[in-house]
């Protein structure tokens, strides 16, 4: 045993939240997709602002129920992970000072888009803007078993068609976690967390997902229609 006094410090990497989209939110999203397909909603090509190597990525309308679900999940993340992301981005005195001046810090979904990926399209490792980001899988036209048939030598470790996070381990090495891409499942994660989407090969149909960024904004409390969720969180 050493006689020296020393302290220990462990490194923590952020995690993610996952849920299946509630039926009422799913119906709202389906209505928006239908209106886009029928030309009732105009979209903008947003590929030049994104990292994806995809044939089509377009703006998607921000709707009430989806916005409420996502901002609520951000607050859930803060509760579960002890406000870790906020503490990294904002000094507590800054939040406390402006809260006392009548300002509210709240989450707002500001950027939303839909991804249409064809065979061989992919997203290289990248990060997003904002505090939190999410991906919602709408259509996955293949199964893991179908993709593994193209690469049998991978012996169950085939990554084609998969979604993957990258983060630091406790000893500083880069590790990753593959996340299953189930239709109508949503994953929320810190925007600074690197992630990637691998190409698929077994199907000629489109892989469709929706992604977006949620920001942490300061607004005057007099302009807020809902209670200030941060008045009791002066940590």
What are these regions (language model features)?
Residues 1-102, 112-115, 119-123, 159:
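Non-heme Fe(II)/2-oxoglutarate
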Residues 12-16, 133, 207:
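Short hydrophobic/aromatic beta-strand or adjacent loop that forms the aromatic wall/cage
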Residues 169-235:
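Catalytic core of Fe(II)/2-oxoglutarate
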